Amino acid sequence: MKTILGISAFYHDSAASILVDGKIIAAAQEERFTRKKHDSNYPFYAIEFVLKFAKIRLRDVDQIIFFEKPFLKFDRLLETYVAFAPKGFKSFAKAMPIWLKEKLFQKNLLFNELKKHDENFIDIKKIYFSEHHLSHAASAFFPSPFE
């Protein structure tokens, strides 16, 4: 049995899903638990829900997939700011400290948050990052009738 926990967080509409042998067992958006529309925080309650629904402990999950690669997003962000410079400089100046301090190093952030679900979760190597646009494509393709 192969289990995958999918996580979307820190942008908008945080959510979690769990797949077992390629089949979606449960999925939930964090806003359903926090009642905060478009909640961007770490989806603690959504993860708790999908794990409980699937009757799986976090330590037993084979892979944890985050919806995007932080360095690719940072690269896109820089390209956008350069393309529109000097417009948007205030936004750029505000965003950079957050990116340089936290967002580029999300693997450690995710690991620390995941430990809140299961203190025995110790394998940071289970955390992977997918390309954002491939995540969108996969969410459309895999449940479709196409092979």
What are these regions (language model features)?
Residues 1-147:
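Short acidic/glycine-rich loops and adjacent helix/strand connectors
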